């Protein structure tokens, strides 16, 4: 049979145990979730400054951007492989965009992409 202790002694030993376990525990770091949310928000504010976006809509937009990114990357990779190249260049990306996006949307995407690449190379 276990030895009996007074109520005060039991409480004290319980407190001591809690303090030890709290100090031994390390703080868990919050894992980072990569997202396009800040960029989507910046574009939204450029186009419609007075419009907001819900977290669910932001999640959908983030999924959309990830999906399009994966499709373009896969198509560009395929094009590089067909042409026996080991590097994906802006040319492969541009061709992939032309193949994936319909008509006018592809034209606008290519012109915006070209503008972004030109801006990037001139700033170097």
UniProtKB/Swiss-Prot annotation:
Location(s), subcellular: Nucleus; Chromosome
Coiled coil (UniProt feature): none
Presence of the UniProt keyword DNA-binding in the record: yes
Cross-link (Glycyl lysine isopeptide (Lys-Gly) (interchain with G-Cter in ubiquitin)): 119
Domain of life: Eukaryota
TM ranges: none
Region (Disordered): 1-32
PROSITE patterns (UniProt xref): HISTONE_H2B
GO cellular component, one term: nucleus
Keywords: Chromosome, DNA-binding, Glycoprotein, Isopeptide bond, Nucleosome core, Nucleus, Ubl conjugation
Post-translational modification remark: Monoubiquitination of Lys-119 gives a specific tag for epigenetic transcriptional activation and is also prerequisite for histone H3 'Lys-4' and 'Lys-79' methylation. GlcNAcylation at Ser-111 promotes monoubiquitination of Lys-119. It fluctuates in response to extracellular glucose, and associates with transcribed genes.
Glycosylation sites: 111
Pfam families for the chain: Histone (PF00125)
GO molecular function, one term: protein-containing complex binding
Assembly and binders: The nucleosome is a histone octamer containing two molecules each of H2A, H2B, H3 and H4 assembled in one H3-H4 heterotetramer and two H2A-H2B heterodimers. The octamer wraps approximately 147 bp of DNA.
Family to which this protein belongs: Belongs to the histone H2B family.
Biological function: Core component of nucleosome. Nucleosomes wrap and compact DNA into chromatin, limiting DNA accessibility to the cellular machineries which require DNA as a template. Histones thereby play a central role in transcription regulation, DNA repair, DNA replication and chromosomal stability. DNA accessibility is regulated via a complex set of post-translational modifications of histones, also called histone code, and nucleosome remodeling.
Protein name according to UniProt: Histone H2B
């Amino acid at each position: 049979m276990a030895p009996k202790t007074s109520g005060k002694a039991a409480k004290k030993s319980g407190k001591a145990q809690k303090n030890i376990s709290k100090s031994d525990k390390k703080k868990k770091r919050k894992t980072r979730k990569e997202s396009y949310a800040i960029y989507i928000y910046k574009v939204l504010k450029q186009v419609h400054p007075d419009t907001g976006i819900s977290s669910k809509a932001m999640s959908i937009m983030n999924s959309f951007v990830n999906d399009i990114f994966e499709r373009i990357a896969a198509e560009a990779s395929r094009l590089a492989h067909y042409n026996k190249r080991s590097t994906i260049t802006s040319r492969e990306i541009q061709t992939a965009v032309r193949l994936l996006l319909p008509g006018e949307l592809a034209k606008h995407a290519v012109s915006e992409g070209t503008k972004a690449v030109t801006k990037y190379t001139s700033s170097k």
